[in-house]
Design a protein with these regions (language model features):
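Membrane-inserting effector segments that mediate pore formation, membrane fusion
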Residues: 83, 88-115
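Terminal, membrane-proximal amphipathic helices
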Residues: 1-83, 120-173
Length: 173
């Protein structure tokens, strides 16, 4: 039996989650970037063999993409954007969640909300990374590796410029 429950988060609710994220960022300042990535990967590994609700599973794919984006040596995300992404991943360093993970059906609700909020904030970066990965995959066809660094660099620069334009536009609105 499937039960669908839908809810909206008010501005007040979002401020509450923003406050929690700020606390996590403050605590994560003591953590090296590698620790933040490692903690996020540990969460992903733990959940890989866990029966989580579909809404959580969908968000975990976004979380995996965030980690990949930050660690992808070919994408070479600039330092400012890496910092922004790591700030978003900071919530996953803390072992104590807003909602304890062991509660069936709901335990990962706070994680899913945080992932969604971080993904919303990182939309320009995630879009650029998604397009970069698609481009790289398409060019991996047999015989397409000649000049690989050049065509990856060219596409990367285009996408990072687009990302910056979108970020500026988003900040103005």
């Amino acid at each position: 039996m499937l039960m669908r429950i839908s809810f909206d988060l008010s501005d007040n609710d979002l401020r509450h989650f923003d406050l929690i994220m700020k606390e996590a960022r403050k605590a994560a300042k003591k953590s090296a970037p590698e620790q933040i990535i490692s903690a996020t990967r540990e969460l992903l590994a733990k959940l890989e063999n866990t029966d989580v609700p579909a809404f959580v599973e969908q968000r975990l794919e976004l979380l995996q993409m965030m980690v990949a984006m930050v660690t992808d040596d070919e994408f070479k995300l600039p330092a400012a954007e890496v910092k922004r992404a790591l700030n978003g991943l900071a919530y996953f360093v803390e072992p104590d969640d807003l909602i304890p993970d062991h509660i069936p059906g709901l335990g990962f609700l706070d994680d899913a909300i945080m992932i969604e909020l971080v993904a919303r904030d990182l939309r320009p970066e995630l879009d650029a990374y998604r397009d970069f990965c698609q481009f790289r995959e398409e060019r991996r066809a047999p015989g397409e590796n000649e000049g690989r660094e050049g065509w990856l660099d060219s596409r990367r620069r285009q996408l990072l410029e687009r990302m910056r334009r979108r970020r500026k536009k988003k900040q103005r609105s």
